[in-house]
């Protein structure tokens, strides 16, 4: 669960970067 949330945050951060 925690890892999934971390992955989601990283993906979201990448989405914001673009």
UniProtKB/Swiss-Prot annotation:
Q: What else is known?
A: On the 2D-gel the determined pI of this unknown protein is: 5.1, its MW is: 29.3 kDa.
Q: What is this protein called?
A: Unknown protein from spot 146 of 2D-PAGE of etiolated coleoptile
Native source organism of the sequence:
Zea mays (Maize)
